[in-house]
Amino acid sequence: MKDFTPTFYTLECVATGREFPDEGWTLDDAQCKCPSLIRTRYAKKQLELKSDEYGFYKFADWLPVRRMLENSKAPVTYKSKGLAAHLGLENLYITFNGYYPAIGAHMTTCSFKETEAYSVCARIDENEKRVLVVASAGNTARAFAKVCSDNRIPLLLSVPADNLDALWFDGPLDPCVKLICSEKGGDYFDAIHLSNLALKSDKFYAEGGAKNVARRDGMD
């Protein structure tokens, strides 16, 4: 594992502009009187890419993470030939998130959701004892399961039974990853409802979805 120093950042309420420190797993501004997202403000104004050895964390200057996790892979940008020729373009570049070894892309879940999962899970305190809860209908569940399994981060997935075929992996998962399912005929909203029932216990905490700055910054 390469040496890593987390970048300094603060959080800002989009509605009010109030800037405040991240207390660890802040998902909103407690002082804001209206619904609003929060966003990150990084001390480094210029993104300095690290070497490819850092995997996804080559972008760490603009990620709200505490540490680097194992087995991360970065998106790959390459100059298009076939599509560029079809469109009559000379300088078309494509950024690819997935599995395509021929161009150096090795995200084994074949999904851009890996970038979100590696960002969110690296924001978690290493001493966190509670179980992370994620509701998903497919790709997000697969990505979080892979990242949490590889790094032994306790995870509870809530997935509709009809979407279980989306949970394929290239190997067995660590027992730290658990699964609950809404019954057949249910959908994503049923999975969310089921996850919210688990969150009534103080042994669990919500990933947060779009409210989690690490989710959005990881995808950017």
Where are the model-predicted features located?
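PLP-dependent amino-acid enzyme catalytic core
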Residues: M1-D220
